[in-house]
Every structure is written in structure tokens, then in C-alpha cells.
Design a protein with these regions (language model features):
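Leucine-rich tandem repeat or coiled-coil scaffolds
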Residues: 1-417
Length: 417
């Protein structure tokens, strides 16, 4: 089967033998994989059985559907990725997935985002990863595993030495498991990227940020860290910055959708004057205002030559701050990507960024604005570009190759790409 893959035929036989009706979505994807196997299977193939795919018949994958599929893929060593996002897998399906992960020695990428997996399902999947030595990238985004489910993944991180990317964003985790995960990462040497976006926090003391900061002081393997929607304030940013003076590995820091003001950005500006590791900084949807933008522009113009991408989308910045950042780009040639939409553009801002684009200093693919002229006045229109435009969805009509739009510039690509 690994030499001459015929996934669809095996799926038909498996459905007939178990009495399970064929799922049209699975059948369509397997037929397409069989058709393309000559050029693709030797490098490994990712089966994209996403329940939000509008170009093929969509009957979302159930627990019973996946049980049959798992039996088909048991010996398919050329299948190295499995995308099951936006289906209806529950804890029962997670049990089948755990068995599959224990027996499978080929899968490197698994996307389970936005299914219906809960705490017991998280326990089973995390338990399977205690022994799995193949999987590199796991996305659990949007499954409501809760604080207890997150604790099982924290325990897994103490045992697993293979997993490189773990996405636990929007999983309703609480402060206890965030602290446990941060503690586990003080010893885990394999995780390169972790997403902890949107936990459920009930305290204003920012204990979780303090523990993440302590972890960053000792962790030398983490490259990408997402702390969006953490209700983080200036105190939390100060703690992170103190840790990052001693950290030389983190290259992508996501602090979007927090409560950071210009005073917090001042700490980041001072950090950028000395830090020689950060390449991507996401400050979208904070309230950094002109003063914060000026702090950043001073650091970028005079000191920092490492940062390559900056997002300040919807950060309540006006013309003075935006013009200052455009001026920094004229002297800092390393900063190649900047995203500014959602701020308050005046004519000076429009002129400044139009000039950067026309002179070739800022490439159209590296920003989210495009200049146009009406009655002799320059304006800026929005472009669909950004650091994580395709975090929750992937366009069905095209293959998105740009790392700038999908994730990090810096982290090494794994099986998802």
C-alpha cells in the first residue's frame, strides 16, 4: 500500500466491511490524493479533509467516519499530514485519534481546530503524545478542552521530546494550566512555537505573564510565542521585556489584542535597542497611540537592525506616530514588513507611505495599504495582507505560500507547509 497507494478503494472496502456509509468529503479527498500520488507521495502528502471546504461536497467528518479513515491510513506511510479542521469530532473521535497516534509512525502534522473535543478527549490525545515520536505540529485551536484539558497537555510537554509546534489558542484554558505549561517549557527543549491565545483569566494580577517571563529567562529553544487576548497591561509587558534581555532565541512575539498603552511600548522600545533576536512583533489592537509609535520609531531608526516585521493594526495611532515610523523605515533597511491599517490616517501619513511604496522601499506584498489618488489627494486603501491573515481559514481558491501571511518569517517550516 505504501508503494502503490489506492486510498479511495481501501476506504470503500473499509466502509463496506464495517457497514459505515461513505462520507462524500473523505471519498473526494482520497480520490484526489490517489490521482496526484505519482508526483507527491514520495515527499509525503497532507490530506485536507476540512469541514469548511466549499469546493467539494461537504458532509462533516463524524467520530465513526474517522474510525474508518484511521483504519485506511494505518499503513499509509506517505500520508504525513492530516487536516480535520471544522468537523464534528467529539471525545469519542479523540479516542480513535489517540489510538491512531500511538500506532502511526508517519504523521507529522495534525490539525483538529474547531471540532467538539473536550476535556476527556484532550486527556486521550495528550496521553498518546507521551509515546508518539513522530508528530511535529498539533493544532487544537477552538476545542473547549478547558483548564483541566490544558493540564494534560502541560504534563505531555514534560514527556514528549518531538513536538515542535503546539496551538492551544481559544481553548478556554485557565491560569493554572498556563502556569503549568510555562513551567514545563522551562525544561522542554523541543517546542519551537506555542500559541496560548485567549485564555479565560479571572485575575488582574497578571500571574500568568510573570510565569511566562520566568520561563523565557531560561528557555533557549522557543522561537514563536503567541500571547494574544491575555488582558495584558503595561506591567506584564515590563516583565516580558526584562526576560527578553536575557533571551536570544525568541524571534516572533505576538502581543495582539491586549491592553498595552504607550507606557508599555516604551519598555518594548528600550528592549529593541538591545535585543538582537526578535524578528516579528505583533502589537495589533492595543492602544499604543502616537507616543508609543514614536518610541518604536526611535529604536528602529537608531538602534535595532534585527526586526523584520511589525504589526500595529488598529492601535489608535494618528499621523504623527505613523509618519515617524515611515521615517524610521528610510534609515532602517532591515524592517521590510509593516502593517498599519485601522489607524487614523491624515494626508501626511498617506503621502509618507505612498512615497515608501513608490520608491521601492516598501513592497506591496509587505504591507496592508495601497496608495491611490483622487482629485490630486493621495489616500490609502486596505490590502488583504498581514502576519496571520490565514490563521483561522485557508482560501479554497488558491494555495497561500506567503509565510508573511500565514505565520512566522523565522521559524523553520514543518509538515504543514
Amino acid at each position: 500500500m505504501s508503494v502503490h497507494p489506492d486510498l479511495h478503494q481501501h476506504y470503500v472496502w473499509a466502509c463496506q466491511s464495517t457497514g459505515q456509509p461513505e462520507n462524500p468529503l473523505i471519498a473526494c479527498v482520497l480520490q484526489e490524493a490517489d490521482k496526484n500520488h505519482i508526483t507527491r507521495w514520495t515527499k509525503g502528502v497532507t490530506l485536507k479533509i476540512a469541514g469548511n471546504n466549499h469546493l467539494v461536497p461537504v458532509q462533516r467528518v463524524t467520530d465513526d467516519d474517522f474510525q474508518v479513515l484511521a483504519s485506511v491510513l494505518h499503513n499509509a506511510v506517505f500520508v504525513t499530514g492530516l487536516d480535520l479542521r471544522c468537523n464534528v469530532l467529539t471525545d469519542a473521535g479523540a479516542k480513535h485519534m489517540a489510538t491512531f497516534l500511538q500506532d502511526n509512525s508517519a504523521l507529522r502534522y495534525l490539525n483538529l481546530m474547531f471540532n467538539d473535543i473536550g476535556t476527556s478527549g484532550a486527556e486521550l490525545i495528550a496521553g498518546a503524545l507521551h509515546r508518539n515520536e513522530t508528530l511535529l505540529h498539533l493544532r487544537m485551536t477552538g476545542n473547549k478542552i478547558g483548564n483541566k484539558g490544558g493540564m494534560f497537555f502541560a504534563s505531555m510537554l514534560q514527556m514528549n521530546s518531538t513536538l515542535e509546534k503546539l496551538d492551544l489558542g481559544d481553548c478556554d484554558m485557565g491560569p493554572q494550566c498556563l502556569i503549568a505549561i510555562a513551567t514545563a517549557l522551562t525544561h522542554n527543549k523541543s517546542i519551537k512555537a506555542i500559541n496560548l491565545n485567549r485564555p479565560l483569566l479571572y485575575s488582574h494580577e497578571e500571574e500568568t505573564t510573570v510565569h511566562v517571563s520566568l520561563m523565557l529567562k531560561t528557555n533557549s529553544s522557543l522561537v514563536e510565542l503567541h500571547l494574544g487576548k491575555h488582558d495584558m497591561k503595561n506591567f506584564g509587558v515590563e516583565q516580558l521585556c526584562e526576560a527578553l534581555y536575557k533571551n536570544s532565541s525568541l524571534r516572533y512575539l505576538d502581543l495582539s489584542c491586549n491592553k498595552i498603552t504607550c507606557d508599555g511600548v516604551k519598555f518594548l522600545g528600550e528592549l529593541l535597542k538591545q535585543n538582537q533576536a526578535l524578528e516579528i512583533l505583533d502589537l495589533s489592537a492595543n492602544c499604543i497611540e502616537d507616543a508609543g509609535a514614536i518610541y518604536l520609531s526611535e529604536a528602529l531608526a537608531l538602534y535595532n537592525r534585527t526586526l523584520r516585521a511589525l504589526s500595529i493594526v488598529s492601535s489608535n495611532i494618528k499621523g504623527k506616530g505613523l509618519v515617524a515610523l515611515s521615517g524610521a523605515m528610510k534609515t532602517n533597511t532591515e524592517l521590510s514588513h509593516i502593517y498599519i491599517w485601522g489607524n487614523k490616517f491624515d494626508e501626511a501619513t498617506c503621502m509618507a507611505f505612498s512615497e515608501l511604496i513608490q520608491m521601492g522601499r516598501l513592497k506591496p506584498d509587505c504591507t496592508d495599504v495601497e496608495p491611490y489618488e483622487v482629485d490630486g489627494h493621495v489616500h490609502l486603501a486596505e490590502l488583504s495582507h498581514g502576519l496571520q491573515k490565514h490563521y483561522y481559514w485557508t482560501p479554497s481558491c488558491e494555495v497561500v505560500m506567503s509565510k508573511d501571511a500565514n505565520a512566522s518569517l523565522a521559524i523553520a517550516a514543518v509538515s504543514e507547509y
